[in-house]
From Swiss-Prot:
NCBIfam families: PRK02304.1-5. This is Adenine phosphoribosyltransferase. GO terms for molecular function: adenine binding; adenine phosphoribosyltransferase activity; AMP binding. CDD domains: PRTases_typeI. It is an enzyme of class 2 (transferase). The gene is apt. It catalyses: AMP + diphosphate = 5-phospho-alpha-D-ribose 1-diphosphate + adenine. GO terms for biological process: adenine salvage; AMP salvage; purine ribonucleoside salvage. Keywords: Cytoplasm, Glycosyltransferase, Purine salvage, Transferase. Catalyzes a salvage reaction resulting in the formation of AMP, that is energically less costly than de novo synthesis.
Amino acid sequence: MEILNELISTYKDHPKEGIDFKDVLEIVQHPIVFKELILKMASSKIVSNAEALISIDARGFIFGSAISFQVSKPMIFARKPGKLPGELIKKKYTLEYGENSLSIQKKSLNNFYSFAIIDDLLATGGTVNCVSNILKDNGKKITGLLTVVELIELEGRSKFDFPVESWLKCK
């Protein structure tokens, strides 16, 4: 999908100096490209081998929701602090430009064993690693990670013991 490269905008020094932020939102403004991407992502073995999908706050929700709809599988939300009600499983993580934490509703994991993780971008792997640790700590299996963009120089995929599929690899 060569066109993806044209639809990813780069913002220098965002959210802080030294970070080149890759923005995937323009993909959604091109429905034919978005649909083609979702169909490709949805056909991945990572998705077919999972009982449920787990998407990461917030841009991962865009792709995760569309894939969930396409394959009729449940989607679980990994959210930033203060966004989810109920009993939560929380974990802190470090990312390229700071520290944060993610929460998942405990009851949302109860009925499923295997999960595909979906996000918009893989950089250092901190966010995905946080989600994978929550899942593993709760006895769950990860079928893999699907991401639109992968920043290959940051070698995020090297942190994982599960498959990673990305549709656009950038420096």
